[in-house]
Amino acid sequence: MSRHPEVKWAETTEKIFLTVVLADTKDTKVNLDPEGVFDFSAKVGPENHVYELKLELADKVNVEESKINIGERSIFCIIEKAEPERWNKLLRVKKPPHYVKVDWDKWVDEDDEGSAGAADMDMAGMEGMGGMGGMGGMGGMGGMGGMGGMGGMEGMDFSKLMGGMGGMGGMGGLEGLGGMGGMGGMGGMGGMGGMEEFEDSDDEEETAKSGDKKDDAVKEEGLATEKAPAAEETTSVKEDK
């Protein structure tokens, strides 16, 4: 036997905000047709309890512009009205069932629709929402099966995803950090080893200069030795005279 989940709703002139309060759903199916008939079914829990809904909305809707988000705690729908006007009720029936309640947290009075708060509420939960149109052929909303596409993350090949990360070429450029291997170029600081060669060349130059000085000293010494006998010869000549 199926059960009925709690349903909350609010409206603006152009939209209906519909929340099916049901956590951790499986095999979730949603269908919305242009006449405003909303069908929902899902399984919950280890025993796969079945929850179902069939709501005949107060007026026609624009399925293609409507959106849905299947979350962990609830299923949130933004249903676009076919004609922009206040319905003042959710269903065609005079007395709604006990599980259908007004969502006062999202309710916006007609006079307040242009306010920033109303705009924020309109955008709430929009991130990650899929269109209800073309959702798998479930009457316009059948596309909601496409919401399985949301679950499609489960079927995503993460190796390809990571490969795509490689596509963040700049990140691949981190291989350039291998260029940090270029820090090995700091080994080029080994070229600073060239500083040692530079110092050696200085030493050699100084040694060479020192050797030159020694050679000069030896030459001067030789000259002095050569001049000495001449002096002696002069002395002996004088003595002979």
Curated annotation (Swiss-Prot):
Its main location: cytoplasm. CDD domains: p23_hB-ind1_like. PROSITE patterns: CS. MGG repeats lie at residues 129-131, 132-134, 135-137, 138-140, 141-143, 144-146, 147-149, 150-152, 162-164, 165-167, 168-170, 171-173, 180-182, 183-185, 186-188, 189-191, 192-194. Residues 188-241 are annotated as: Disordered. Disruption phenotype: Short root length. Impaired cell division in the root meristem. Residues 129-194 are annotated as: 17 X 3 AA repeats of M-G-G. One of its GO terms (biological process) is regulation of auxin polar transport. Pfam families: CS. Residues 225-234 have a biased composition (Low complexity). Transmembrane segments: none annotated. GO terms for cellular component: cytosol; nucleus; plasma membrane; plasmodesma; protein folding chaperone complex. Residues 207-224 have a biased composition (Basic and acidic residues). Widely expressed but preferentially in the root meristem. It is found in: Cytoplasm; Nucleus. Residues 2-91 form the CS domain. Induction: Inhibited by heat shock treatment. Belongs to the p23/wos2 family. Interacts with HSP90 in an ATP-dependent manner. Interacts with HSP90-5, HSP90-6 and HSP90-7. Acts as a co-chaperone for HSP90. Controls root development through the modulation of auxin distribution in the root meristem. This is Co-chaperone protein p23-1. The gene is P23-1.
